[in-house]
Amino acid sequence: MKNIFLHSLILENYRNFKNLELKIDNTPIILIGENGSGKTNILEAISLFYPGRGLRSAKLADICKTSEDHCSIKALLQSKLGLAEFTTQFKLSSNRRITEYNESKIANNELSKFTSMVWLTPQMEGIFTSGKVERRKFLDRIVYNFDPKHAELVGKYEYYMHERNKILAEEIQDDNWLKIIEEKMADISNHIAVNRLKTLEFMQQTINNLENEFPKADLSIDGIVEQKILDGEENIVSVITAELYKTRNKDKLIGRTSFGVHKSDFLVKHKKKNILAKLCSTGEQKAILIAIILAEMNYAIKLTKIAPVLLLDEVFVHLDDKRRDYLTEFFTYLNLQLWITTTNLESIENFASKAQLIKL
């Protein structure tokens, strides 16, 4: 098994840090400090070496230290392709983020070719009751760990959808170009939907077979494109293309694309109770979310033979002893680079004795 892990992390003008340099090993790392000391900021910085906007989904303008025009994050990282230096930097004046791999610029959605990450934060505990956009993004992040090209597909789909909306809004009379865009969207949609369904199938198998202290979940996706694939619809790309053509006038009026894989919802049920997770108690929702993360870790390692970096923000808060003990044993068994934030070591003293402690 190959581990993805950081050797070092350097922050400049990032959030509350003017300068911070950490040297770390391929071991569990515990960031300990009072609330507001910057523990979650460090996790967020690491998460920016994965497709997307990090574990907070923050606007780039918010991550620079107050009164500074730029910020940067550097990491020496054992990647899928070996030891490499990654840099991501942002300038307020240009409102651009630049990411580099060994001093060569790469697109944000290419990061999954090099890294693999999973995270769990308190903000995610409301994912079942929030809008479907957040749940869909959560599902796609899971897929990134199993198919590195999925992030690029999602990025391309969003680009072509934006182009289609622009052509419709500006009443550009170019049916041929619009047809080409819709055909590209349809082809990419098919790949995205298949990737999601395939991942959910294997995730469900993993959940069913994994015995732990957390409730089992039933996973599904509510989406027209995904359902057509499940129903065995033939010529799915042509069907999607035809639907996009049919909705042109409607989409022109409302100013957005009303049909497609960007409308799908990731649904999660409490298996034993047979109710949607959003109807469960907050404690049950957190437990179900942890169960999904555990299944993702198991499936990722089994399928790809790669252990991702795991970022856990205050994950032990409000867990009973049995579940806390299970998690510490599970993480020890996985032998991966795990980052945990906490305000104290109470109840995890044994686990802490095997970890690298960083006090903030």
From Swiss-Prot:
Classification via SUPFAM superfamilies: P-loop containing nucleoside triphosphate hydrolases
NCBIfam families from the UniProt entry: recf
InterPro entries according to UniProt: DNA-binding_RecF, DNA-binding_RecF_CS, P-loop_NTPase, RecF/RecN/SMC_N, RecF_2
UniProt protein name: DNA replication and repair protein RecF
Molecular function terms, GO-annotated: ATP binding; single-stranded DNA binding
Gene Ontology biological-process entries: DNA replication; DNA synthesis involved in DNA repair; double-strand break repair; SOS response
Ligand binding (ATP): G33, E34, N35, G36, S37, G38, K39, T40
Subcellular location as annotated: Cytoplasm
One CC-aspect GO term: cytoplasm
Alphabetized UniProt keyword annotations: ATP-binding, Cytoplasm, DNA damage, DNA repair, DNA replication, DNA-binding, Nucleotide-binding, SOS response
One Pfam family linked to the record: SMC_N
Family designation: Belongs to the RecF family.
PANTHER family cross-referenced by the UniProt entry: DNA REPLICATION AND REPAIR PROTEIN RECF (PTHR32182:SF0)
HAMAP family listed in its UniProt record: RecF
Function according to Swiss-Prot or TrEMBL: The RecF protein is involved in DNA metabolism; it is required for DNA replication and normal SOS inducibility. RecF binds preferentially to single-stranded, linear DNA. It also seems to bind ATP.
Coiled coil: none
Organism of derivation: Rickettsia canadensis (strain McKiel)
